[in-house]
């Protein structure tokens, strides 16, 4: 657990938020891997049947920040509020998922999304858990399919999933190598 002061954690958050903006602009989130410990875990629930869990910085870079972000190059995750708990070295950031559509307009996934982090003694992420409303995510992707705004990368991801391809990092509900909680 982090022993950082409130000021040090605020500086960490500022760096994290700027790195996210830089990655969104580049359409490549893999550089965020520099914020994670070698043995970090990063997971989230993907509806009533599956969890996603990446164990170790390589899986985090390649799966969570790589494969899972493919097709989202036209998306931004605007942090709306960040809460810092300096006693536990934990941070919660609440974000909106916003898509830039081909006609120049934007749309966003309804509901609350966010990331919950714990930093270790070296002030790198020990674990991260994301949360979002899967029903609203599915609805947005259906809307994007109907309007023709679903990116080619996301179309390929959906096709792989529909074809039954085993996606790396996906586990039956409650069977991930590290628990969500």
Where are these regions (language model features)?
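Charged, low-complexity, helix/coiled-coil-prone segments
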Residues: 1-13, 52-63
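Short acidic-aromatic low-complexity motifs
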Residues: 2-39, 70
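A beta-strand edge to alpha-helix "cap/lid" segment located at domain peripheries
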Residues: 3-4, 8, 68-181
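Residue-level detector of alpha-helix boundaries and kinks
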Residues: 5, 17, 45-49, 102
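Short, mixed-charge, low-aromatic patches
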Residues: 13-24, 50-53, 70-74, 126, ...
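A solvent-exposed, acidic/Ser-Thr-rich amphipathic alpha-helical stretch
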Residues: 29-91
